[in-house]
């Protein structure tokens, strides 16, 4: 079913997932398109970003953001067109970056919106390279990782939206960059297109040994966004005073048991102490929101100079969002996962 001018399709949380989300957990509802009142505007969704953090918002465990309530629209960044406006600062046709979630239409009073250039050649980049994923990779690497020329930087999910930015920015800064990805095609893309120095397939039976060979001088910066067995292989290779920015642990988002259970926590703490590691988590807009303009200017410059490559994995149709999201959580996407909701 394509987007209608009369019906608003909304994916809502019907119940909290146990493991991988299903269509019983996330259900499609249809309502009349709402009409804007004074000071409001009607946003029409063009592109929807799918990101791993959304899975955490479906649980009711304590976290850095409040959980979704049952019946809430699934959260998500969006690029929208202003369809109707009763707001003094926005006109019909304006292009905006919003967080209106998994739905065709939404009302907004302008809070949290960011205007985009109406003639932007790749509006979806506002959800990827120039949006939250790119911002996450840039700030985590440069502020916490702070790679120096000649150091070895390792990043998992290297072909993805965050990892690809981490590696390319590290190369610009003169570091040696080793990626970790799943499968030969992704590893080939990482080395041939993104120009990483090496890439290791985490699906390989001898993954840990391959990673060790790819990092003969050890690891100075490990950008953590996966966790689990990948971190197990990285930990012994970390050099003294290595930095570990932590932006996510996608391997744990569906509730799998962590490789570092409570009885192994002393091992991790011992490594942190003996090697004087800096392990720091961060929540991008909470910790670095005021530096977004700095990031946007720099990344736009690099993009214009051809120094940054970025791949999108675009799925057509809001109705396909659930299956696409499931694929994201199991590593099936290749690049920044975007749902094209309308043209």
Whereabouts are the PLM-identified features?
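Mid-domain Rossmann-like dinucleotide-binding core that forms the NAD(H)/NADP(H) cofactor-binding site
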Residues: 127-205
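Glycine-rich phosphate-binding loop and adjacent beta-alpha segment
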Residues: 229-308, 340-343
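C-terminal hydrophobic helical "lid"/dimerization subdomain
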Residues: 2-6, 286-343
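A short N-terminal beta-strand-loop micro-motif at the entrance of redox/enzyme domains
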Residues: 2-3, 15-46
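Short, glycine/polar-rich helix-capping loops at beta-to-alpha or helix-loop-helix junctions
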Residues: 103-104, 182-190, 207, 264-269
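NAD(P)H dinucleotide-binding glycine-rich loop of Rossmann-like/cofactor-binding domains
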Residues: 74-81, 89-157, 199
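Glycine-rich beta-strand-centered segment in the early N-terminal region that forms part
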Residues: 33-50, 58-102
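Short amphipathic alpha-helix with an adjacent loop that forms part of the alpha/beta core around
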Residues: 206-216
């Amino acid at each position: 079913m394509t987007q209608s001018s009369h019906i608003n399709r909304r994916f809502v949380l019907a119940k909290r997932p146990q493991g991988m989300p299903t269509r019983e957990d996330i259900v499609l509802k249809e309502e009349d398109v709402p009409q804007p009142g004074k000071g409001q505007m009607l946003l029409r969704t063009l592109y929807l970003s799918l990101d791993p953090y959304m899975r955490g918002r479906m649980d009711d465990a304590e976290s850095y953001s409040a959980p979704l309530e049952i019946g809430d629209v699934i959260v998500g960044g969006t690029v929208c067109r202003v369809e109707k406006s009763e707001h003094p600062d926005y006109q019909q046709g304006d292009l905006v970056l919003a967080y209106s979630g998994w739905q065709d239409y939404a009302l907004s009073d302008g809070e949290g919106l960011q205007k985009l250039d109406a003639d932007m050649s790749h509006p979806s980049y506002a959800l990827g390279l120039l949006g939250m994923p790119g911002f996450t990779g840039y700030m985590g690497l440069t502020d916490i990782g702070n790679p120096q020329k000649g150091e070895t930087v390792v990043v998992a999910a290297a072909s993805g939206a965050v990892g690809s930015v981490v590696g390319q920015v590290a190369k610009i800064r003169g570091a040696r960059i080793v990626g970790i990805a799943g499968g030969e095609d992704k590893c080939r893309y990482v080395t041939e297109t993104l120009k990483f120095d090496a890439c290791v397939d985490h699906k390989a039976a001898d993954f840990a040994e391959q990673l060790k060979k790819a990092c003969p001088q050890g690891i100075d910066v490990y950008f953590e966004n996966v966790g689990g067995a990948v971190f197990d292989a990285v930990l012994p290779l970390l050099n003294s005073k290595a930095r570990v920015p932590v932006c996510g642990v996608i391997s744990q988002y569906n509730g799998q048991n962590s490789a570092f259970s409570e009885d192994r926590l002393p091992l991790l703490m011992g490594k942190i102490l003996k090697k004087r590691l800096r392990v720091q988590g961060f929540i991008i807009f909470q910790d670095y929101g005021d530096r977004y303009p700095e990031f946007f200017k720099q990344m736009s410059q690099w993009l214009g100079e051809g120094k940054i490559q970025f791949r999108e994995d675009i799925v057509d149709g809001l109705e396909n969002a659930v299956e696409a999201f499931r694929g994201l959580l199991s590593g099936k996407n290749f690049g920044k996962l975007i749902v094209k909701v309308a043209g």
